[in-house]
Amino acid sequence: MNTDIDYTGIRPDRKSDEPLHIQLHRALVREIRSLPPNRHVALMSERELAIRLNLSRRTTHRAYEQLLEDRLVRRRPDKSLMVRQDARSRMLGPYPVIGVLIPMDFSQFVQNNGRNAVPYLEGLIGCSSGLNASCIMLRSPEASASPAEIEAFAAEHFPRLCGVIHLGGLSRFNTPCDPVLEQLLKHTEIPQVCISGSLPEDHVGSVCADPAQGLDEMCQVLKERGFRRVGVIGRKFEPQLFHYIAEERSSAMCDALTRNGLECVLRADLPDTGTGAAVEAILTRPDRPEVLLCHNDKTADLVWRTARSMGLRIPDDLALAGYDCRPGDPRLASIMTSPGDIASAAVEMVMDHFRNGISDANRLRLLPTKFVDGKSLYKPGVHKRNIKKNRT
């Protein structure tokens, strides 16, 4: 956040049909929103601002009078204007609105993301309503949109929001280029929070699941059941502006194995195409691991089906574990990430950043994961135990 009013970014457009004093007022409100909470900041005098922006004194006067009417600033005894300490609270209002950026039509977004999207959306909407706030989906401009179109989108929506939540990148293509997201990140006047990922900006917060606890619990179970040689099957990620926490999952699995005294004998990243053949190659290795930890439950299902087609039995010939924990499947051991809790924490972070600003203390929040047992990790002849159906 800025520590003072940044007048360099205020550029009223004389060609616009919108009156100059309204443009100036909106720009000043944006700058006030960018200030840290409870900061005493004086405004430039009407005369100085008029000279700086090449505007009439009457234009700056009308913009300042509107700020006074909004009760965002107060007049001091020397007639100068000071930003009120409660200005941000007044902007928030009694019914806050949080925007969730999505790169496509909402129905298509849910259809494309299916099982992964719904728990996050439930958490976002549920927590928002509990805080007497509204959560709205905002379809971002297309990647081909011009900078002016992207700014028009921000000008239309951001002034009425207390924050924005990012579910991922805004480009539909797996490329490092994400021009819409890159431009929207320049708007420091509004809190921005990422779910299950991060962005390379100090003014953006992140809420993620910490894989360490769940993986450590699983590693202890592997040791108790006599497993020692473990493999990790990940997936390839192309570099993108939005950094998904899932990109670090394979490394987190390998670190957990090492940390818990287990041997990681294989690490393989599946390609986007030809995954079936890649899995077959892993399963036919003469040094095939005793256990395979998979990037997610979908990958584990693919490994399971491929193994079965090759005559391999799970868990008799190969033990298996997934990640992200599909509800209602007691067969597959997995790591539960609680997406609803992550989404709720993101809403809480937006409200916290709006009221108190962002700092090193509240920029990142990690929620613990937990191991959920399944029959796929049962080792015949070593342990006889019932696998509890503790998935919700």
Residue spans for each PLM region:
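Hydrophobic alpha-helical segments within soluble ligand-binding/sensing domains
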Residues: H203-I233, T273-A281, T337-N356
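An alpha-beta-alpha
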Residues: D216-L262, L266-R267, S359-Y378
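Amphipathic helical "hinge" segments at domain boundaries
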Residues: E18, I22-V29, S34, N38, ...
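Extreme N-terminal segment that seeds HTH/winged-HTH DNA-binding domains in transcriptional regulators
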Residues: M1-L55, R62-E65, R115, A155, ...
